[in-house]
Amino acid sequence: MKEITQLLEEFWIVKDKNTTDYYRIKRSIDNQMKNFLTDFVGWKLFVTNKLIKLEKLPAEAHPFMGIQRFESVNEYMLLCALLIYLDEKMDGTHFLLSELIENIEKIIAGYADIDLTRFTDRRSLIKVLKFAVEMSMLKISDGSIEAAEQDQSKEVLYENTGLSKFFSVNHDSSISEYTDYHDFENRSSLYTDDETDMVRTNRVYRRLLLQPSMYWDSDDDMDSIYLINQRQYIYKHLDKYVGGRLDIHTGAAFYMISEDNVFGKIHPSEKSISGFIALMCGKIREDIATINNSK
């Protein structure tokens, strides 16, 4: 149970970085867990000699699902260019920052107005490189990225770990004609009737697992119909592998993770801001009650 919640919480489990969890999770993976993740949720589970990754594709795109430290589209484009560059490198290959910059500029030319001699664009690249190091896609063999951020003449020697090939999603069909994220959400038109039923099942499980809530505004909503009709079966699966409580109300459903399996950012936390927020909410509720009673 805790193994799946950790796979939900973390992008991937890298063996060199977290050896204990890597082997613990690897030992826990059985055919039943694989069937739940692939057949019902529709996610791919990668287990290699370097990492374990649950490819958590959402049913719907939401702002909180992005890379939180990234602040512009250009930073995502620089990350994509970095992934393209690393894809052509053998595992363990070393390269200099100047070589990387030269190749990224070639890759990105014609797609965006990015000049890596400009302070803002170079700062964006440094942010992307720091992210790649934290994600274990790159290792710094020599030099300092902070020094290179302040002085463009400074070099950094990087090593390609080979993990970048598992970072992006491998889609089952071409996405070359897609123009925005809605195209990924509306792929159901590509499937047969039987496949559409499977896609609906996957979508409901994904919404419950990755979103704080699942809403609908029509009695004809197919996802809600499936959820209500199959609620006992869905709850049984989620309780077995994740642990929690499925609450269904008029127009909304919530999957509440049990206290023992809570992951991610939670409220209230031990920080003082949590106590302040609780006090403010209590005061607001008192004021609302006073206003209502005075009517």
Where is each model-derived feature located?
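Short helix-coil junctions and helix-kink-helix linkers
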Residues: 15-27, 102-123, 134, 217-224, ...
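Internal, well-ordered domain-core segments that constitute the primary functional module
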Residues: 84-162
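A charged, low-hydrophobicity C-terminal interaction/regulatory region common to genome-maintenance complexes
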Residues: 259, 267-269, 292
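Eukaryotic partner-binding/assembly regions in large regulatory complexes
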Residues: 1-68, 129, 144-265
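Intrinsic, low-complexity N-terminal interaction/targeting segments
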Residues: 53, 67-75, 115-119, 123, ...
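Positively charged, polyanion-binding regions of nucleic-acid-associated proteins
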Residues: 9, 73-94, 274-294
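A short glycine/small-residue-enriched secondary-structure motif
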Residues: 46-60, 74-80, 101-106
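Extended Gly/Ser/Thr-rich low-complexity repeat segments
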Residues: 64-75, 266-273
